[in-house]
UniProtKB/Swiss-Prot annotation:
Parts of the chain that traverse the membrane: 14-34, 80-100
One of the GO BP terms on file: transport of virus in host, cell to cell
InterPro entries assigned to the protein according to its UniProt record, in alphabetical order: Plant_vir_prot
Keywords: Host cell junction, Host cytoplasm, Host cytoskeleton, Host endoplasmic reticulum, Host membrane, Membrane, Transmembrane, Transmembrane helix, Transport, Viral movement protein
Membrane topology reported for the UniProt record: Multi-pass membrane protein
Highest classification ranks of the organism: Viruses, Riboviria, Orthornavirae, Kitrinoviricota, Alsuviricetes
Name of the protein in its database record: Movement protein TGB2
Lumenal side: 35-79
Cytoplasmic side: 1-13, 101-119
Length: 119
């Protein structure tokens, strides 16, 4: 009986961890970019969520009428594309790292690394 010294490649056990990290990062990214800040302005009858004005006889209310950021749904100046570009670059860097650190061969190795395989 011939003994086989070849060691098979280990299965990739990291894909659930990578999938969980990607899901958490996506959730965090969407949470940061989709913040809605409902303001509590006005009185007990009139509420203005994103600014506006009301005039009634002796009462006049103006809230954020001249603020251009009041109507875009976000209180920050960071846009979706400004947040998406770093996420895209980090994802590309991670993909490149995983691509260039993979083994050079797909055959089973004899106890040594595939990079030193002379096939």
């Amino acid at each position: 009986m011939v003994r086989n010294n070849e060691i098979g490649a280990r299965p990739n056990k990291y894909w659930p961890v990578v999938a969980a990290v990607v899901a958490i990062c996506l959730f965090g990214f969407l949470t940061v970019t989709n913040q809605k800040h409902a303001t509590q302005s006005g009185d007990n009858i009139h509420k203005f969520a994103n600014g506006g004005q009301y005039r009634d006889g002796s009462k006049s209310i103006k809230y954020n009428c001249n603020n251009p950021r009041a109507y875009n749904g976000s209180s920050s100046n960071i846009t979706f594309s400004q947040l998406f570009l770093p996420v895209l670059l980090i994802g590309a860097a991670l993909y490149a790292y995983l691509w260039f650190t993979r083994p050079d061969c797909s055959v089973t190795c004899r106890g040594d690394c595939c990079r030193s395989y002379g096939g």
